Amino acid sequence: MTLEDGDAETIPEFIISSKDFKEGGEIPKNCGYKHGNKQPQIQLQFNPSISAAAFALIMDDPDAMGAVGKVWVHWLSYRRNDAPYPINFVQPGNMIEGKTDFGEIGYGGPAPPDKRHTYVFKAYALEVDLGDLKEGYSKQELEDAMEGLILAEAKLTGTYAP
């Protein structure tokens, strides 16, 4: 549903979706770290009553805990609310990205070492711009910067097998 589809009263408060996979569905193979590492198209839609100054996205793999002993961070992205609605996390040049657990800045696709894993995409609408956030930030730095500033959050999950 988009703003064009109805009035503000009928728009969900804050949702995250992907054009590449449905909630709980299979993330495309070419989005995998070793199979093209293509960013999935992630989109945020929100009710205009949320006057967010910025948005953040965290993609991680809680299933990695059993394989590597930690929740693996695959993507950290932050962007100001300076683009047309809906907000997309695939437009280069308007995002500040953090460092993944692969040691790289930007998107690092699924790479489960053992079995099918579930990946969690968490989106946050933020009250203010996190102007001090610099490229290469960690998940902890992003979470610390967002503390007390989250207006709304949404979650999308997808699976990927080796």
Roles of regions detected by a PLM:
Residues 1-162:
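N-terminus-centered regions that define maturation/targeting leaders and the start
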